[in-house]
């Protein structure tokens, strides 16, 4: 009998496996970039150019209620390149205490947004949303001192965040000078 092949884009894109363990999405999350007067929505596996993701995105949480709080992590598991990601993962952003039914601007930015700058190959940029047990739960224990070598699994375990409740990723690669014009 043939093994069942998953059609989940997070499995196909190896986000589940490389970054987090298998989970069931229970909250809807939207990630929207507004760079250079161009609005780009993030969909699993779609490609966005670095010039389209320069500014901090708006991440909307469509679930929970105002008494629920969420932690958002953005990471790149393909550093310095996808064929040899020995610096895996590179942390791009952490926002904690995001109230349900709001967006990331209502949370507490504990690691500032760093725009994607892929140098070698196609990188995956992953947004993960975790439900907190209470406000102020994710206190960066221990504090992040280096963005390279970040480990989402270890961070969520140390801060008792459990598995994600939502995730989305996009692909991004270095733009040629001709493309940026």
UniProtKB/Swiss-Prot annotation:
CDD domains recorded: PEBP_euk
Naturally occurring in which organism (per UniProt): Antirrhinum majus (Garden snapdragon)
Disulfide bonds: none
Family as reported in the entry's similarity comment: Belongs to the phosphatidylethanolamine-binding protein family.
Entry keyword Cytoplasm: yes
Protein name listed in UniProt: Protein CENTRORADIALIS
Signal peptide: none
Pfam families: PBP
Described function: Expression of CEN leads to a morphological switch between shoot growth and the development of flower structures (inflorescence). May form complexes with phosphorylated ligands by interfering with kinases and their effectors.
Keywords: Cytoplasm, Developmental protein, Differentiation, Flowering
Cellular component terms (Gene Ontology): cytoplasm; nucleus
GO biological process, one term: negative regulation of flower development
Cell compartments where the protein resides: Cytoplasm
InterPro entries assigned: PEBP, PEBP-like_sf, PEBP_euk, Phosphatidylethanolamine-bd_CS
Record text on subunit structure and interactions: May form homodimers in solution.
